[in-house]
Amino acid sequence: MAFIATLSTGSGTATIRLAGELDAATAPEFHDAIDDAVATGAARLVIDASELTYIASAGLRALVFARQKVAEDVTISLVGVTEPVLKVIKMAGLDHGFDITAS
C-alpha cells in the first residue's frame, strides 16, 4: 500500500489521516501535511493512524516534529493506533506527548 497523508479541517480541528508505511521515504509527505495543518490555526490536531501499518524512526521523528510545530495550547491526538504502531511509539517513549487512542 502506498503511503497517504490526507488533511481535512472543520470545527477548529485539523485531521491528518495516515495510511500505509511511515518511514524515511514517506516522512516528508507527513511533514507537509503537518505544515498545512498548522497553517489552518486549528486548536486541535488529530492524527488518524487507523490505516498506518508501519512506523520507522523517521516516522517517530515526524511525530516529534508535529509536537514542535504546533502551538503549546494545541492538543494533538493520535487515534486508531494499531498495536504494532503503538508498541513502537511506546518503546521510543513518545506516548507521553500525545493523547493516544488505540484501535
Where in the sequence are the language-model features?
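Short acidic-hydrophobic, aromatic-tinged amphipathic segments that line or gate anion-handling sites
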Residues: 99-103
